[in-house]
């Protein structure tokens, strides 16, 4: 295992490499060409290339967490006459519904429950009876449960019905192969501190340029105006409208180099997938059960039912694991008592093996 205080087994922020951390030791000037052209513009080009080889796409970086970018897209992509169908089966789909409500955006929330895969036929039926829907928005990897949602099938519906398609790929982009043009995605949203394995500080949107250009004057926010941010970066060669998170950006540039060195998204996906499978097999051997069936799991994070033993307390389990150098995630499912373990970031097979040994030691309720 790499040198660290402890291993973050979370869906981001996550454990980063020493070299990603070291990239932040340099101070950059936000108006300097070495930074804007040499770093920011290179990142924008690399992100677009990771998303698709098709022409007509661009990328925008935005200060803040991933939710800032989700709100920027919803607040900029939808005009007063538009309506969005939000497919929700977890906390992050529900957050989009909340955002739309607060911004006064017309929306239809299709909530299929936290442990159910969205029913594509039901989505088809909603689109068929409501022609006022102009946009579809959904989460790809719903980290509430660890479920991977069917963005390909919903994308086919968006294309067939002529709807603008927004995908929150926060914890999947860079870790799961995808071609956003083939998936008919118009806006893909992700964050620096997820599968690219950078650190928190900014999010990004990869968008169909024609769609983004139509957002002029629509934003319901000054700071979260996606069109204005894009035009500033386009017109000023990587310049951010407001203070750029320079150290985070330098870390992200290094993280992109390390993604390429690993073998790209396909190789990283293979590592994540093997991590997750080994984790589930080991946890089941220790007596834990997964919340979801195997075919629903993403290779990003897994939810496990909490032990039914009356002595079990998550806080104590967490403390004992942290003492051994491992940090896991509490549950977020409303109807079940669970905890979650992520396996993305600078996490390898040996780390999963060591984690399982630590979990066995931390199972105080079995002793």
Swiss-Prot record:
GO terms for molecular function: 2-aminoethylphosphonate-pyruvate transaminase activity. This is 2-aminoethylphosphonate--pyruvate transaminase. It catalyses: (2-aminoethyl)phosphonate + pyruvate = phosphonoacetaldehyde + L-alanine. It comes from the Bacteria. The lineage of its organism: Bacteria, Pseudomonadati, Pseudomonadota, Gammaproteobacteria, Enterobacterales. Keywords: Aminotransferase, Pyridoxal phosphate, Pyruvate, Transferase. Its cofactor is pyridoxal 5'-phosphate. NCBIfam families: PhnW-AepZ, PRK13479.1, transamin_PhnW. Its EC number is 2.6.1.37. Belongs to the class-V pyridoxal-phosphate-dependent aminotransferase family. PhnW subfamily. One of its GO terms (biological process) is organic phosphonate catabolic process. Involved in phosphonate degradation. Homodimer. Pfam families: Aminotran_5. InterPro entries: Aminotrans_V_dom, NH2EtPonate_pyrv_transaminase, PyrdxlP-dep_Trfase, PyrdxlP-dep_Trfase_major, PyrdxlP-dep_Trfase_small, SP_NH2Trfase/AEP_transaminase. The modification N6-(pyridoxal phosphate)lysine is found at residue 194.
